[in-house]
């Protein structure tokens, strides 16, 4: 098949594009190569993808509709996967406008593109952050998600709502997946695992927020990609509605639209995560304990039942194994 993927120079987009290329598909990657973190890392990812004859890279910002249209002309996509976004909860406190530009205006342009070319399936990346102040644990897709705690989460929730309206109005089969703390090789330098490994290696203190009492449903990148690949083949329709007394399918009654969590449902305490990193590095961290930061939540915890019902797949790579793979990659590259 032919794919247009936004964000292929980013962490998740790179891994998804590589998987699809390895499977023999044609991929056009669209990325703004923004300097939110080291552009050299993005260039290295793109160079790896460019080794495949089935990959074409287009550089452009999501806000630039003409550039996005050009990428679509090259791709002639059967499937669009929209992964590009301004990410990072804490950075959204410093530079909220970039989140509106990328996550709202950019996503609107992707939706307009889908309206124009009518792909077989449109898939969009959202986040567990949309659950916000929801106190019900674990998080199921049908749970209340109306009190976002950051502009990042608010823009992602807004994208979900816009996507539903486009699916309804223009009959675009659409799946939104909510990610849960993705980690692994080639990850972003601003994420906890990368920051902790780098700090411990160089004898710098690590900053542990919430006094270490938080937990996260860490999802290894290969598991996430497997979940996405399987969902690509599950085009939302009444034919695959999940009918169950225990699973609430989010398939809309008014549109070919569905929201699916991609998370393992096995949250890990932050201190246990730190101890795992220490064990892999053979070195104890210098710990700087800090209070909860604005926008943070105490826990994330996915209910993966809908993903399992639709695809037969559940994230399965344990944190110990995932951290080991990241540390091995880091030591080889840094």
UniProtKB/Swiss-Prot annotation:
Reactions this protein catalyses: UDP-alpha-D-glucuronate = UDP-alpha-D-galacturonate
Cofactors, names only: NAD(+)
Top-level taxon of origin: Bacteria
SUPFAM superfamilies in UniProt: NAD(P)-binding Rossmann-fold domains (SSF51735)
A Pfam entry, by short name: Epimerase
Cysteine disulfide links: none
EC number: 5.1.3.6
The keyword NADP appears for this protein: no
Its biological purpose: Catalyzes the interconversion of UDP-D-glucuronic acid (UDP-GlcA) and UDP-D-galacturonic acid (UDP-GalA).
Protein's UniProt name: UDP-glucuronate 4-epimerase
Organism: Rhizobium rhizogenes (strain K84 / ATCC BAA-868) (Agrobacterium radiobacter)
């Amino acid at each position: 098949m032919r794919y247009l993927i936004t964000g292929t120079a980013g962490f998740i987009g790179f891994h998804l594009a590589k998987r699809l290329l390895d499977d023999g598909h044609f991929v056009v990657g669209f990325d703004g190569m923004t300097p939110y973190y080291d552009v050299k890392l993005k260039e290295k990812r793109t160079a790896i993808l460019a080794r495949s004859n089935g990959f074409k890279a287009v550089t452009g910002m999501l806000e630039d509709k003409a550039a996005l249209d050009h990428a679509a002309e090259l791709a002639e996509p059967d499937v669009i996967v929209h992964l590009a976004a301004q990410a990072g909860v804490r950075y959204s406190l410093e530079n909220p406008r970039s989140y509106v530009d990328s996550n709202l205006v950019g996503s609107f342009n992707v939706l307009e593109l889908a309206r124009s070319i009518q792909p077989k399936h449109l898939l969009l990346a959202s986040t567990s952050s949309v659950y916000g102040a929801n106190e019900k644990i674990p998080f199921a897709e049908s749970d209340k998600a109306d009190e976002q705690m950051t502009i990042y989460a608010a823009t992602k929730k807004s994208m979900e709502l816009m996507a539903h309206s486009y699916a309804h109005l223009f009959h675009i089969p659409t799946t939104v997946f909510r990610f849960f703390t993705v980690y692994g090789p080639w990850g972003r330098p601003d994420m906890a695992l990368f920051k902790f490994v780098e700090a411990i290696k160089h004898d710098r203190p690590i900053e542990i927020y919430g006094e270490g009492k938080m937990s996260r449903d860490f999802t290894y990148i290969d598991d996430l990609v497997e979940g996405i690949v399987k969902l690509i083949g599950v085009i939302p329709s009444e034919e695959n509605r999940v009918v169950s007394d225990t699973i609430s399918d989010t398939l809309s009654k008014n549109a070919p639209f569905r929201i699916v969590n991609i998370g393992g449902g096995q949250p890990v305490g932050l201190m246990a995560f730190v101890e795992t990193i220490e064990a892999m590095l053979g070195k104890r961290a210098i710990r700087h304990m800090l209070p909860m930061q604005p926008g943070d939540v105490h826990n994330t915890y996915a209910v993966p039942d809908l993903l399992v019902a639709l695809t037969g797949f559940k994230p399965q790579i344990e944190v110990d194994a995932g951290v080991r793979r990241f540390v091995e990659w880091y030591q080889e590259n840094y």
